[in-house]
């Protein structure tokens, strides 16, 4: 993912299986079920795939050769259909609740004229399934990165762009992401109670507190606690609330593990806190300088966030730190910070410490069984997706294995998202390729009966199966 800093830019539902042949559709009811995924059944890849060695429409070497991949949207096609699309497709979210839950994917454009698009997974027409909802440059939106579905049924994104004197670093809510038909009727609202930072990861805990980060060398981790955590709309949720910066072992330190406390950087209503909050010229709060005043613990380019819920109900917040090649875990029940993955973690392919083979961890994703995936911010030929094993769920991984490797020249993989209604489907974007043709790729584990048909030589382009909500 690109790292946008003001003035300077630093680099930083349908289950479809890819084969050839006819479209088979099987309608069925959605139902809740315990999840079991086939994505953890693989032999770790020993090395990267060579840059440019695979077609852009199927750019990944996958660690299990039975898994399939198919392009479900690409930018060149969108432009040919007259859709405004500035490219650099970034993080992915789906409509996880409400009517037609799981039907749509949403993603922002991480460009100087950013926007938001939606992919309809139930639309078989490749030319019409993807629609731009927020036109590039709306409200001066730049560097769209964050992507999250809210508990009340809307879509959040935010700007990965912040610096002293900036007007960016804002959080936005698309309040009608499912019902909007395009740019003409979408409702895109800035939520100004959130302090300005260089946004990437967003996550809600079970109490509906919202976590976010400042992607910066020396960036902090934050928690927003709404005065109305059970709000049924964003107007009420973001009306008033307090933001805190994480302190580990007392704060005022770097890359720390140990005891967690939360230091306020705003008052209870989201306004300035005397002696702590730093105001921008427009009256908004500078989250970065305010966290420094509150002695928030600094991490080195914290990027994506994920929350995992354990069987006992405890929740662990994970954060990737790109500069230090680490992933941290923060147990929100015990208030303990740990190092989840670093250079000393064992590589499943060699049995030795992974060292600098794992480089620039950026995105995180969690599958239906709670397994963690780490996506590198690297160019094609070096960009890998890693599977992390934490068998005892203590927040410290025992090993990592290379799960996929991407070949597309000039690109990086981003936004890995596991379908909440089918544990054997995932989506990932191929961002800023040299060709300029960003893509969304669907990766799938064939169901046993489907795989048998493949072995028998029967062809499928798509297979719509019963959608099962994952618990």
Short names for language-model regions:
Residues 447-466:
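A short, hydrophobic C-terminal helix/tail in secreted or cell-surface proteins
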Residues 7-9, 284, 462-465:
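General helical secondary-structure elements
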Residues 468-471:
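Short, charged juxtamembrane terminal tails flanking transmembrane helices
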Residues 6-7, 21, 43-46, 241, ...:
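Generic alpha-helical secondary structure signal
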């Amino acid at each position: 993912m690109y790292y946008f800093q003001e003035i300077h830019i630093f680099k930083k539902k349908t289950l479809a299986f890819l084969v050839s042949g006819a479209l088979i559709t099987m309608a069925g009811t959605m139902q809740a079920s315990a999840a079991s995924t086939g994505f953890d059944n693989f032999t770790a890849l020993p090395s990267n795939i060579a840059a440019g060695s695979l077609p852009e429409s199927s750019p990944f070497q996958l660690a299990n050769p039975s898994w399939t991949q198919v392009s479900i949207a690409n930018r060149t096609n969108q432009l040919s259909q007259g859709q405004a699309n500035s490219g650099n497709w970034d993080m992915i979210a789906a409509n996880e609740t409400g009517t037609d839950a799981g039907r749509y994917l949403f993603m922002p454009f991480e460009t100087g004229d950013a926007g938001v698009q939606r992919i309809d997974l139930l639309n078989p027409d490749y030319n019409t399934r993807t629609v731009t909802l927020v036109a590039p440059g709306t409200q001066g939106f730049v560097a769209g990165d964050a992507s999250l579905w809210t508990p009340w049924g809307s879509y959040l994104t935010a700007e990965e762009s912040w610096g002293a004197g900036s007007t960016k670093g804002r959080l936005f809510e698309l309040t009608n992401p499912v019902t909007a038909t395009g740019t003409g009727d979408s409702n895109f609202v800035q939520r100004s109670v959130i302090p300005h930072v260089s946004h990437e990861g967003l996550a809600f805990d079970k109490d509906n507190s919202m976590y976010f980060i400042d992607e910066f060398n020396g960036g902090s981790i934050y928690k927003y606690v709404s005065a109305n955590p059970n709000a049924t709309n964003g107007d009420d949720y973001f009306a008033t609330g307090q933001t805190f910066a994480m302190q580990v072992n007392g704060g005022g330190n770097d890359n720390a593990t140990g005891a967690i406390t939360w230091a306020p950087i705003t008052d209870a209503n989201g306004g300035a806190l005397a002696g702590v909050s730093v105001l921008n010229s427009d009256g908004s709060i500078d989250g970065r300088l305010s966290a420094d005043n509150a002695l928030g613990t600094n991490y080195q380019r914290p990027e994506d966030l994920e929350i995992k819920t354990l069987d006992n109900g405890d929740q662990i917040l994970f954060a990737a730190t790109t500069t230090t090649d680490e992933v941290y875990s923060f147990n929100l029940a015990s208030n303990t910070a740990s190092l989840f993955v670093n250079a000393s973690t064992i590589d499943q392919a060699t049995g030795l410490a992974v060292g600098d083979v794992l480089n620039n961890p950026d995105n995180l994703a969690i599958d239906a069984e709670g397994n963690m995936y780490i996506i590198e911010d690297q160019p094609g030929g070096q960009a890998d997706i890693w599977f992390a094993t934490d068998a005892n769920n203590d927040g410290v991984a025992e090993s990592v294995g290379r799960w996929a490797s991407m070949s597309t020249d000039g690109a990086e993989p981003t936004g890995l998202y596991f379908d909440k209604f089918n544990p054997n489907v995932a989506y990932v974007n191929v961002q800023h390729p040299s060709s300029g043709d960003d893509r969304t790729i669907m990766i799938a584990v064939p169901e046993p009966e489907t795989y048998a048909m493949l072995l028998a030589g029967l062809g499928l382009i798509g297979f719509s199966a019963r959608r099962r909500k994952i618990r």
